[in-house]
């Protein structure tokens, strides 16, 4: 993943001001900074949820600016996984169907999608909750369902926006363990967080953002 001189303006306001950074396959990078510094805009650019005013965003060798809206949506579903603070699950679908839907939207058959979804729920330790609706799941269980959904299409890049922000301490630690395990088997991670503990536990590199730019970049020593 690469950002090259990315600017994003909303009217007279500059959200990103020449942002440049690069992740290699297998990297685990945390992004931190004060509210309004451009972290969320950065994540939206990488996810293809918003387009830069100028500059280039490249993911998995693809310049996102060269894709039309339909192509961008399909690319995102196939190659980018996303985990959100508040889970973004569909209340009317049980856990298994919430996960399987991610693959069905790329054209995978319902049968194959459900089989893959069940495998992921089993790997994440919640296969016994496959028929449970989100409202009946704990916060930690809901985030595991969200992680399974994000992994359905074997994404080149996994984006996490405050992935433990809505969880209690125990559930948050479990999600951190999960992110570490994923990175250890080669999953590339970009994590936006306000939590220094999450950053030092789950990432090997820290990007500090201020005023829409990379203010500092540093290596992180793993913490327990």
Stretches with model-predicted labels:
Residues 109, 223-224:
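Alpha-helix capping and helix-coil boundary motifs
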Residues 1-203, 208-210:
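ABC family nucleotide-binding domain
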Residues 211-222:
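Conserved switch/coupling elements of ABC/ABC-like ATPase nucleotide-binding domains
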């Amino acid at each position: 993943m690469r950002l090259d001189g990315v600017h994003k303006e909303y009217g007279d306001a500059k959200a990103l001001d020449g942002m440049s950074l690069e992740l290699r396959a297998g990297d685990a990078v945390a992004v931190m900074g004060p509210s309004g510094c451009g972290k969320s805009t950065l994540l939206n650019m990488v996810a293809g949820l918003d387009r830069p005013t100028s500059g280039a965003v490249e993911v998995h060798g693809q310049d996102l600016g060269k894709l039309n809206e339909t192509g961008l949506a399909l690319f995102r579903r196939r190659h980018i996984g996303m985990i959100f603070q508040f889970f973004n699950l569909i209340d009317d679908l049980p856990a298994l169907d919430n996960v399987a839907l991610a693959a069905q939207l790329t054209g995978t058959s319902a049968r194959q999608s459900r089989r893959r979804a069940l495998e992921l729920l089993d790997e994440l330790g919640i296969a016994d909750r496959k028929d449970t609706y989100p409202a009946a799941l704990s916060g930690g269980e809901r985030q595991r369902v969200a992680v399974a959904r994000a992994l359905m299409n074997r994404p080149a890049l996994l984006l996490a926006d405050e992935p433990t922000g809505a969880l209690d301490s125990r559930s948050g630690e479990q999600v951190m363990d999960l992110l570490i395990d994923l990175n250890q088997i080669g999953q590339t991670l970009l994590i936006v967080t306000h939590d220094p503990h999450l950053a030092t536990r789950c990432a090997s590199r820290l990007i500090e953002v201020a005023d829409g730019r990379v203010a500092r970049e540093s290596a992180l020593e793993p913490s327990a």
